[in-house]
Amino acid sequence: MVTELVDKATNELLIQTDWTTVLQISDILNRDPIHARGVVRQVTKKLKDRSRVILLALELADSLLQNCHCTHVYFAERTFQTELCRLIMNKKTKLNVKEKTLEIVESWGNAFQARHDVPGFYETYSFIKRSGYKFPPKPSDAPILNFNNSPAKRTVSTTILTNNSHSTTPPQANVPSFNNVSSVGSNNAGGGGSSSQPIKNQEISSIKGSTSVFNEMISFLNVEDEDPQENDLIKELFETCKQSQIRVKEMIESGSTNERDLNVLLKLNDEINNALNDHEACIKRRRAFVENGYKPVPPPQQQQQQQQQQQQQQQQQQQQQSHSNNHNGTTTTTTTNNNNKNPSYLTKHKELEEIDFFKAPDGISPYSVQQQLQPFQQQQFNSTYNPFAQPQPQQFQQQPQQQLQQQPQQQQGFNQRIQQPQQQADAFDLFVANRQQSNNNNNNNNINNTTSSFGANNPFANNSSNNNNTNGAIQPYIPNTAKSLPPVSQQLQQPMQNQFSPQPQKFVGSSITPSAPPPFKPNTTQSNPFNTSPPLNNMNNHNNNMMQQQQPQQQQQQQPQQQFNPMYNNNAMAPSYPNYNAIGADNQHNTNPYGMMNHQQQQQQQQQQQPMMNQMNNFSAPTYSQFTNYAQPNQQPYNNNYGGMNQSNMYPNNNMSGKSSLI
């Protein structure tokens, strides 16, 4: 709150001093002296502002000094007094601000001339006076301040200002008591009179003031802009410090000072020496700047750092040599150990301390070069390794020779992307054919076991002539759909048997190859699964029953032998549609959750009820390809309640067993 009042009293928009705000601040400080430091600090900041604000701040400081005695200690500090000296010595300061500052310094110096508890006022006044500055004449109506006497006898003569002035006479009852150092005459160590002690204190305070100002001037001096030897104020301060140093030495060597003053003189002597050394350093920097052609001087290279670097390099070389000697067996440390009679482990410990383990290698090692040249090889782990398995002989032992034979082909323009001619039979085709052949043999054995009870007259019995095996040996069967077909001269195997179709004509040793399938006719009954008329190769059970009742004997006597037609031999594109009505429609034989019976149950029922049905139904059915043969429709009673759809087997099979071997 008090700082806000200070800002209000020093507002640059004010035409004249706001005495109401000034008196309000004074009343607050008299009630609560704790705010005195903050107020003085805020006024010190205002001295760095514009000229109008500086004038208002000086007027506020003068009024607070006269009305509030708690501010004397803070105004006498070095920070505030240094700002006053800066305003006076700065060439850019306006004339009215400089005259007002000189007037305040003179009045405060005379008012606190005999006050050694606050020596800052008189030190600043004496310094400015010795510096040659002329103080402006005092106005006739200016108040005369006197704070030198004791609080009981202190009087302040005041005059009432008529033009834009206010009475600044403080009441004597509110004056605080201060201990006067000069009134104590019994503290003199030499037993001198009381008049000699105030003179010494006055000299010490003046020397302190001049030394502090000299330090401030040198610290703010820019060597590139101004020469310290050409500045008159710095010259005068330098001479004053020289004389003060001589005087301080005399006072220390006299022995007439007490212990308290002796400590003060010793500290003062140190401050003077530091100020003189700084002055000499400024002169040297200015001289180097002029010699460099009025250009900034780069920082000098420190010779000590260079010497230290050289010493470190020498030590490292010595360490490397000693390390190499230790490896060769010729150590030089053993002799020193014997002479000094020190244990060997101490020398080894010292050597380890001297070795720089973080130093980069001097040369390139051949191991690093070899490691960079070699490609990165990721370590491979065998996840399928079985330690209990017996070692097996390697099959492809001639692989390096094959690689050597393939290299010239690659050099002569071998292109891996171009499809190369394949062999006659791939390994994959042979594997599929062998597996299919083994499945057929197993299925045939199962069929023989199921059909042996029906006798030799059973047309569904599997004869030994239909087997593909020759002399009991299993030969690989190569399908027609393989990538590479065998030549024409090679004997073709017998096609896969369809139990529901007549035996096709055998063409062993002939040059006839299966032709292409017939064209697909989309508008025929063969391709329409929703047509009511049955297709040629899918006769339903109802029609079969009717035909069996009308012509049971003609089927046995007038059964023509169907000749092999190569046109339908390789017909893999013949459509065969599933019987959607058979799913869930069979109420009599609903043993399968999909509405169909097992294949063996169907076969047994067909053999008991309709043994010769297959010849009439499959009279016009074309034979399928050698590789993909589809099963004929299941023979079931016509129980379809949906009507219009033919009952046929949903899943194509190769044989009677019901196991699908299609790939």
Swiss-Prot record:
Protein known as: Target of Myb protein 1
Region of interest (Interaction with tsg101), residue spans: 357-663
Main location per the UniProt record: cytoplasm
Annotated source species: Dictyostelium discoideum (Social amoeba)
Compositional bias (Polar residues): 162-172, 522-536, 648-663
Segments carrying motif NPF 1: 386-388
UniProt topology in membrane: Peripheral membrane protein
Pfam families named in the record: GAT (PF03127), VHS (PF00790)
Gene Ontology terms, MF aspect: phosphatidylinositol binding; ubiquitin binding
Subunit structure as annotated in this protein's UniProt entry: Interacts (via GAT domain) with ubiquitin. Interacts with eps15 and chcA. Interacts with tsg101 (via UEV domain).
Zinc found in the keyword field: no
Motif NPF 3 per record, residues: 528-530
